[in-house]
């Protein structure tokens, strides 16, 4: 089995390590030639996962021709949502039709207000598209610690075949047809995590955090209902919604929650954003989310409060009172 991962950040690298035990060859592609040379020489991604060594069957490369010249069992797209369209356009002429595409991006695209699967299907309509999502910190995946994530897509036969090929004892994948529900949970949980981080940073207690998580789940349900009349309960209470929401909202290993904690402790938001080397998905998602909510005529109180804090200069005290 041959797999290509497009995106050599922390998650793309971790997935490569996790799948190295069941794949004969894994291409790990990144656009930055210097970074990929460093990974090749050091056998570590010093920029994002510096303590984890890459097995020998992971082949780092910055050449898209090189990694996509042959047929792949699947191609994993592991870039932030706001970079996904650019990536798809860049590789459009290189990807073989009918090669399954597994999308790890979480969020909503600016301007178009599209979810990741909608972006990919627009540009690469002849490739089966799946969402790979769930509670999965990159460092824990790279350390071979157990996790369960979801593969969501329309073709159950192909999806099940991919799951059988890619799952192992610690990296478990379950199937879902609910592509939309999985993506809604993945998008909103990062914003809710910022809110939970603020509450934690202000030392307002675990009860308050639990309350915000519950309210956040209601906002996921509100958007889900507005986009799709039929709610799949197993999605809401499964790994990709409830599971990922709990994980992201309850530990500072989450970039989104730790960002919120820093805000709660009085750090300057703009200074933090300028210093961050990795994208805070909740920050980049909240603006298109609020535009989508206005378009759908729905109210998402917590997400709106975080948007107003980040982009409308609403005070922290007012934000906290609204969140609670």
Curated annotation (Swiss-Prot):
Compartment annotation: Cytoplasm
Pfam family name, one: NAD_Gly3P_dh_N
Active-site residues (renumbered): 189
Pathway(s) of this molecule: Membrane lipid metabolism; glycerophospholipid metabolism
Positions of sn-glycerol 3-phosphate binding: 106, 134, 136, 189, 244, 254-256
Broad enzyme group: oxidoreductase
UniProt entry keywords in alphabetical sequence: Cytoplasm, Lipid biosynthesis, Lipid metabolism, NAD, NADP, Nucleotide-binding, Oxidoreductase, Phospholipid biosynthesis, Phospholipid metabolism
UniProt-listed PROSITE patterns: NAD_G3PDH
Major localization class: cytoplasm
Enzyme Commission no: 1.1.1.94
Reaction(s) this enzyme catalyzes, per UniProt: sn-glycerol 3-phosphate + NAD(+) = dihydroxyacetone phosphate + NADH + H(+); sn-glycerol 3-phosphate + NADP(+) = dihydroxyacetone phosphate + NADPH + H(+)
Binding site for NADPH: 10-11, 31, 106, 138, 255, 279, 281
GO molecular function: glycerol-3-phosphate dehydrogenase [NAD(P)+] activity; NAD binding
InterPro entries: 6-PGluconate_DH-like_C_sf, 6PGD_dom2, G3P_DH_NAD-dep, G3P_DH_NAD-dep_C, G3P_DH_NAD-dep_N, NAD(P)-bd_dom_sf
GO biological-process terms attached to the record: carbohydrate metabolic process; glycerol-3-phosphate biosynthetic process; glycerol-3-phosphate catabolic process; glycerophospholipid metabolic process; phospholipid biosynthetic process
Record-level GO cellular component terms: cytosol
Similarity annotation: Belongs to the NAD-dependent glycerol-3-phosphate dehydrogenase family.
PANTHER family linked to this entry: GLYCEROL-3-PHOSPHATE DEHYDROGENASE (PTHR11728), GLYCEROL-3-PHOSPHATE DEHYDROGENASE [NAD(+)] 2, CHLOROPLASTIC (PTHR11728:SF1)
Described purpose of this protein according to its UniProt entry: Catalyzes the reduction of the glycolytic intermediate dihydroxyacetone phosphate (DHAP) to sn-glycerol 3-phosphate (G3P), the key precursor for phospholipid synthesis.
The protein's name: Glycerol-3-phosphate dehydrogenase [NAD(P)+]
Organism field: Ehrlichia canis (strain Jake)
Annotated gene: gpsA
């Amino acid at each position: 089995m041959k797999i290509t991962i497009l995106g050599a950040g922390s998650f793309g690298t971790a997935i490569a390590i996790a799948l190295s035990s069941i794949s004969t060859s894994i291409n790990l592609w990144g656009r930055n030639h210097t970074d990929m040379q460093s990974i090749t020489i050091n056998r570590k991604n010093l920029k994002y996962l510096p303590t984890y060594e890459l097995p020998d069957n992971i082949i780092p490369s910055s050449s898209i021709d090189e990694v996509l010249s042959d047929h792949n069992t699947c191609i994993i797209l592991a870039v932030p949502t706001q970079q996904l369209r650019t990536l798809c356009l860049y590789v459009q002429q290189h990807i073989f039709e009918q090669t399954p595409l597994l999308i790890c991006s979480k969020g909503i695209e600016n301007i178009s207000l599209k979810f990741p699967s909608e972006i990919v299907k627009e540009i690469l309509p002849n490739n089966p598209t799946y969402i790979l999502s769930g509670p999965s910190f990159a460092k824990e995946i790279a350390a071979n610690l157990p996790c369960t994530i979801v593969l969501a897509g329309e073709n159950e036969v192909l999806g099940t075949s991919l799951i059988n090929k890619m799952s192992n004892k610690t990296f478990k994948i379950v199937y879902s047809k609910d592509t939309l529900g999985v993506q809604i949970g993945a998008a909103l949980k990062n914003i809710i995590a910022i809110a939970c981080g603020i509450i934690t940073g202000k030392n307002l207690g675990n009860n308050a955090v639990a309350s915000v998580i519950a309210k956040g789940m209601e906002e996921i349900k509100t958007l889900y209902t507005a986009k799709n009349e039929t709610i799949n309960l197993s999605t809401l209470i499964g790994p990709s919604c409830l599971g990922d929401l709990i994980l992201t909202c309850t530990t500072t290993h989450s970039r989104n929650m730790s960002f919120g904690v820093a805000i709660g402790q009085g750090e300057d938001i703009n200074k933090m954003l300028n210093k961050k080397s990795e994208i805070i998905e909740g920050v980049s998602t909240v603006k298109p989310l609020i535009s989508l909510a206005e378009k759908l005529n729905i109210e998402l109180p917590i997400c709106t409060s975080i948007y107003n804090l980040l982009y409308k200069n609403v005070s922290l005290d007012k934000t906290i009172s609204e969140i609670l």
